[in-house]
Amino acid sequence: MPMIVDLHNHAERSQNTDLRLEDYVREARRLGLAVAITEHNRLYDRGGVVDGVLVLPGIEVLNDYGDFLVFGAPEDCVAYREIFALIDYVHRCGGVIIAAHPFSGYGVCRAVDPAMAGRIIARVDPVAVLNGRASTDDCEKARRLAMAHGKPGVGGSDAHRAGEMFRMGTRFERRIEGVGDLVREIRLGRCEAVRIETSR
């Protein structure tokens, strides 16, 4: 059964947000969605079903080579500052690493030269092609980048404020019940980025 997960969000353990897990759970329950909490350089410490909503813990790794979302690897992955060492470590742990907002914020295509960005994109798992804080043009460039490298595209709102919640998400062909399912389905490419209609 298909389901939508908003893969990129920040809560009380990120410094630049006033959102809490309860805010996401309340809105996700109304919309019938699941949510990932991806704190800056910290693995969110709550996961599983919370008040009827699936919560998936992840990390947004803020790296000299750009910003990356990680699922299925421990928090100590942030200690790997060299990007290919980080990617290898995440994969050894059985996780996935996502190029977050590659053309906006401190995305990989803004952090390094095009040749290095291409090498990095070739090694990550999917590319975030829809980001709630990125411009339409930057999202389109990310979509083309993912296609050029044969990578799945995923989406997340990157919410830091209430008005930013549940703008973008990722539709999975099969039901996700935990981080293990999420990692497997991303690896198999059984996912696509979607815009979320919050007026439902």
For every predicted segment, state its role.
Residues 99-105:
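Acidic/Gly/His-enriched mid-domain segments of enzyme catalytic cores or analogous surface patches
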Residues 78, 87-99:
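Core dinuclear metal-dependent hydrolase active-site scaffold
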Residues 6-12, 24-41, 95-98:
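Divalent metal-dependent hydrolysis catalytic cores, especially in the metallo-beta-lactamase
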Residues 1-17, 21-26, 45-77, 85-88, ...:
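Charged catalytic cores and adjacent phosphate/nucleic-acid-binding surfaces used
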Residues 39, 101, 157:
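Short beta-strand/turn micro-motifs composed of small residues
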